[in-house]
Amino acid sequence: MSVEHQDAMYDHILVPTDGSAGSVKAAEHAVDLAEKYSGDIHALYVVNVGRLEGMSLNVPGSIDRLEEEGKEYIQDVVDTAENAGVEATSAIELGRPAKTIIEYADENGSDLIVIGTQGRGGLSRRLLGSVTEQVVRLANVPVHTVRADED
């Protein structure tokens, strides 16, 4: 008895990015999976409103500056995908990262989330990173974590 390989296992792969080494490595891994399963990539950057608390959102350019930073990060993911012949789309959302990533995955029919284990939080992050840990616990789709130093 043979089991057929399911080619369309991951049609839509979500790659949240913050420009960190972990998210860059996650994007590369996601593109490999998209190639293997003929899927596409959704690059997502979340402007973290938690970082903005206590700051005046009326300061000229405060949100714009963070969105511009995010555009660079998601463009890197899109370029990686397109260079491999994988279709890619991108989005910038305003919110709390873990919650926004999960909502985006649900609203856009993502089959898989590929996320780095450590973002830009440095030493304040524990083992996985607080955003990654929350996404792993709460997402309604499979989550694949990728270490920044993974070969």
Where are these regions (language model features)?
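Small/aliphatic-rich secondary-structure junction motif
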Residues: 6-55
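Gly/Ser-rich helix-loop-strand patches that form or flank binding pockets
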Residues: 1-2, 107-151
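Short, solvent-exposed amphipathic alpha-helices that sit
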Residues: 29, 66-77, 100
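General small-molecule cofactor/ligand-binding pocket signal
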Residues: 44, 89-93, 144
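Acidic, proline/glycine-rich short linear motifs
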Residues: 45-72
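Structural beta-alpha unit
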Residues: 2-8, 79-113, 150-151
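Short, well-ordered secondary-structure micro-motifs
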Residues: 26-27, 53-56, 102-103, 125-127
